[in-house]
Structures are given as C-alpha cells and as structure tokens.
C-alpha cells in the first residue's frame, strides 16, 4: 500500500499543477477552437492535424498539406513529432480534425512531477518532504510561461537528463543517454540542445578520468539515434532562411529573481514587462520559495555548514559548468539586460547572427542551469535536519508568490470554455469555399498579419484535405520561400490559379486587376475559385464538416 501511495501522490501533484495552470476544457480532442486564436500553439495543432490527416506512412515525420506542395517536417511547425508518431498508427480510427495539445499539456505536468519526485525522493527524510521537494521542482515559472509553445512544455526532459547525470552508474550508460536524446529530438530542437548540455557534462567527467577515458569515447554512440532523427526531420538539409533576429529574445542578467512581468509575482519586485523577448523567452524566474532555498544553499556552502552527503553529490554538478557557461553567453546575447535595460550593446557580424539563427530564442538556453540550481537547492534543504519544515515553508512561499502568474496564464486558456470552433470565420460558407478549392493561398504570405484568420481557414483546409500554399514555420527552406514569393508575384500581377482560394489578410488592397473579384465574408476578403478542384486524396478517414 505504501509503495502504491508514492506514484499516486506524484500523479495527484501533476494533476493539481495542470489544473492550476490550464482549464480542464482544453482536454477533449473535439474542443479545437481555443487553439485557433492566432497563437503559436495553433501552429502546433495544425501541423499535427495535417500529419494525421495526410502524412506519409509511419514513421515518416513530414506532412504534405501545409506549405504545399513541398510540405514540411513536424519539427518545423513545433508539432511534437513524438506525439505524431504515437498517434499515427491510430489515425484511421481517430476523428478527423481532433486536437491533442490539451492532453499533451497534462502529460507534461504528470511526467514533470514524476521525474521531480525521482530526483528528490532518495534525499528526503520522509514522504511529505519528498512531495514538497517534487512540488517545488514542478512549480517552475519557466514551465508555466511556455503555455503558448506546447512542445517546449516538455521540460521533464531536462529533469530526466539530470536524473541520469546525477547517478554515476546511469551517467556512464550510453543507453540512458540515447533514450533521452532520442526522445528530445522527437519533441523540440531547443530541448535536444539542453539535454546535450547534461550529456556533455557526463562525458567531460569521464574524459577527465584516465580509467574511464577509453570507454567514455564509446559514449558518443549515444548521439546516433538523435542524429538520425534530426536527419529525418531534414534539420541537416536546407538551406534555410535566416530571420536575423538573434539577440532579440535574451535572458537578462537578473532573470533568476526578476520575472520582468509585474503580473507574475506577488512578493518580489519586477521590472516592467518590456519587449516580448525579455519577458517571455527570457523568463528564468525561480519564484520566491525556490529563491529562498537557493540563497540558503549559497549561505550554507559559503559558511561550510552544508552536510557532507549532499555536498559530495552536488559537487558533481560542477562538470555541467562549461556547457552551462557557453549556453549563458548565447542566452544573454550581445546586449546584456539589467532591470529591463541594456547595459551595453555589441555589434555582431551578420555571418555570426545568421549562424546563431537556429537558437534565436536564446533566452531559453538558461533553463538547464535554472533547473540544476533549483534541484541543488531542494536537495540541500531535503538533507537538512529540518527538511520537512524548510521544504514545506518554501513551497508555501512559492505558491503565494506565483499565484498571480498561474491565474494570468490560466486565463489564457479561457477560450476553451467556448465550444465554438470558429470565431473569425464563423460563416459555414467558408467550409464550402475551402472544400471546392484545389488549394488555399494567403496574401500576404506572412504569419502575423492576421494569424487567427490564417489558422481558422487552414484548419478547414486540413480537415477537407486541401493543400495550403503558405503556412507559418519555425524554419523555412529557401526553396519554399522562393516558391511562395513566386506565388505572391503572380498574384500581384493579377494572374490567378482558377482552382485556388485566395484569402486576403489585413487591409492591404488587392491588385487593381483583381479588385472586382474580391468578396467578403465575416469581414475577411477573399477571391473564390472559379473552377472546382478534383477530389482530395488523404490517407486517413474521410473528411468531416467542421
């Protein structure tokens, strides 16, 4: 009975954290409308839906409907390839046009709590102390802040990698590293980089030992599965277009104690929110409870009062310092921020910023250090004479401090309580227009003109198995961009494909030659197809009307 109580209490923790973070109405696969609100999680849902609707044979990782005719990898629509691979064999049995992002959020909190408990359990004197420690490692603002990017909510991968690293026997086993690296490669490239930081720390430790040096080199084989998966994504192909935005999304020098969003803390002062990159991508805030434990750890270490057992284990974490320092340099970027303001700015060569474009949201790269420091602080507290009191008090402080953040983030999922599928394109004539078209083309072919309309129309296209000529991607192949630009030039010149539905985003006027053909439904302008398209060809079940 006692043995069963541990996983049960961990599952309860994960479920409670989910309910504090999200509304339960995000869970049903048939509730889709909340994802089509012009946010990045709509991109994730659309890529996955397109893959289940028309993706190649399992275990292919591409979908052909978005950015057609080339299509794109699930990785580049942030659509959680792992989820696609798990669901694809059942695609003929699943309802067309379902969403699984809500269930993914729940899975992430459950797995996060499980790995947090595994990390803390053997250091805690009793079950209550272990639960409080696991709760502290789960109530991480960096996790809750990623509500808009579902794939990046898999921060349990960092805890899994830390769990492997912290036990020397596991850290020497390439099989464990191959598993976590392979799964990370099936979730998100940033998370793969972060897991590599832990792997490189374990490798460095073994290389420093003469006895382990020869066998350590064999550990490089752990990279093979992840490398093959990334090759399957097309990550080594391209070339890909650069956004020239490295440095726009940094982590600040004071990010651990300054959330840069006054709405996210009840107890500590915060600088103004500022730019999205500073307050969103760069958020590394510990929360008051964890910050108190970090300060306590620093004090006990400096004064020699840290117990011998955790001190010896935590000393191994220093092998992670080289990779963490490198990540910190990239995360802080060329214009270090303090209290929301740059201290100075360095001019980087264009070649360097383009090379760093794959990690342009660099502020995220501080997560491994954030989690590792939090873990060290929790372990040190768990090993003290007053462990339960310390961890319980820190947990209470953490909950009080980040309660405003949880409320603000949970409010972002309020649209899930509205059963409507479409709000911007509610007229059912849109379904007929999309179904009759051979393809959908958005003009201008840019994501942030009216992303909500783009997502709603694209969702109809995916359900109807109709290709979409342009769609928002995290990385865009130069060949695809050249074809999209050619589409736009033809449209600007008044040359239309008669089987294509043209949706005009924003308020840019249509080309003079086409002005007379523009129609409006729900305030959205479009040019309908003048010739019906052939029947769609999709691998999964027949289309159903949304």
Residue ranges and their predicted role:
Residues 106-123, 128-168, 173-206, 220-229, ...:
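Membrane-embedded helix bundles of polyisoprenyl
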Residues 402-546:
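Extracytoplasmic
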Residues 75-80, 99-109, 136-160, 186-190, ...:
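Membrane-interface micro-motifs in multi-pass membrane enzymes
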Residues 38-39, 226-301:
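Periplasmic/ER-lumenal interhelical loops and adjacent helix-loop junctions
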Residues 219-223, 325, 375, 381-409:
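Signature aromatic-anchored transmembrane alpha helix within multi-pass, membrane-resident enzymes
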Residues 20-25, 133, 139-147, 230-238, ...:
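Membrane-interface helix-loop junctions at the exits of transmembrane helices
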Residues 1-32, 217-221, 306-323:
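Start-transfer (signal-anchor) and selected internal transmembrane alpha helices
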Residues 17-111, 140, 144, 260-262:
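Membrane-interface coil-to-helix junctions
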């Amino acid at each position: 009975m006692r043995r069963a109580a541990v996983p049960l209490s961990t599952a309860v923790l994960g479920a409670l954290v989910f309910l504090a973070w999200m509304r339960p109405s995000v869970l049903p696969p048939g509730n889709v409308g909340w994802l089509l609100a012009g946010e990045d999680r709509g991109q994730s849902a659309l890529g996955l839906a397109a893959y289940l609707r028309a993706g190649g044979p399992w275990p292919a990782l591409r979908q052909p409907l978005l950015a057609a005719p080339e299509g794109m990898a699930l990785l580049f629509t942030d659509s959680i390839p792992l989820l696609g691979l798990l669901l694809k064999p059942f695609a003929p049995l699943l309802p067309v046009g379902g969403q699984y992002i809500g269930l993914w959020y729940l899975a992430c909190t459950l797995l996060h709590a499980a790995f947090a408990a595994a990390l803390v359990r053997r250091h805690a004197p009793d079950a209550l102390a272990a639960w409080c420690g696991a709760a502290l490692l789960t109530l991480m603002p960096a996790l809750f802040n990623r509500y808009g990017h579902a794939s990046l909510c898999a921060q349990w991968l960092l805890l899994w990698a830390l769990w492997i690293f912290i036990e020397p026997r596991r850290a020497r086993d390439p099989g464990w590293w191959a598993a976590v690296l392979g799964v990370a490669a099936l979730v998100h490239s940033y998370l793969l980089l972060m897991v590599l930081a832990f792997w490189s720390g374990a490798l460095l430790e073994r290389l420093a030992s003469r006895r382990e040096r020869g066998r350590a080199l064999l550990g490089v084989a752990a990279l093979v599965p992840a490398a093959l998966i990334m090759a399957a994504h097309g990550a080594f192909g391209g070339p890909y277009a650069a956004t020239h935005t490295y440095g726009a999304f940094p982590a600040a020098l004071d990010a651990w104690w300054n959330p840069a969003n006054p709405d996210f803390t009840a107890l500590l002062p915060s600088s103004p929110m500022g730019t999205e990159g500073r307050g969103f991508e760069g958020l590394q805030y510990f929360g008051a409870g964890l910050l108190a434990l970090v300060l306590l750890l620093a004090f006990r270490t400096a004064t020699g009062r840290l117990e011998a057992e955790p001190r010896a284990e935590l000393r191994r974490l220093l092998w992670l310092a080289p990779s963490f320092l490198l990540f910190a340099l990239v995360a802080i970027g060329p214009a270090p921020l303090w209290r929301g303001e740059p201290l100075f700015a360095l001019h980087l060569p264009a070649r360097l910023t383009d090379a760093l474009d794959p990690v342009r949201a660099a502020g995220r790269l501080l997560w491994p250090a954030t989690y590792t420091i939090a873990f060290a602080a929790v372990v040190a507290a768990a090993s003290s004479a007053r462990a339960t009191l310390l961890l319980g008090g820190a947990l209470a402080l953490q909950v009080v401090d980040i309660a405003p953040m949880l409320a603000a983030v949970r409010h972002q999922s309020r649209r899930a309580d509205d059963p409507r599928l479409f709000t911007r394109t509610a007229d059912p004539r849109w379904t007929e227009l999309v179904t009759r078209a051979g393809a959908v083309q958005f003009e201008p072919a840019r994501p942030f003109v009216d992303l909500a309309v783009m997502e709603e129309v694209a969702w109809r296209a995916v359900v109807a198995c109709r290709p979409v000529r342009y769609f928002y991607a995290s990385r865009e192949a130069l060949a695809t961009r050249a074809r999209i630009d050619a589409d736009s030039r033809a449209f600007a010149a008044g040359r239309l494909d008669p089987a294509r539905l043209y949706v005009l985003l924003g308020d840019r006027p249509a080309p003079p030659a086409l002005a007379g053909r523009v129609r409006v439904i729900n305030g959205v302008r479009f040019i309908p197809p003048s010739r019906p398209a052939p029947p769609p060809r999709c691998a999964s079940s027949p289309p159903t009307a949304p």
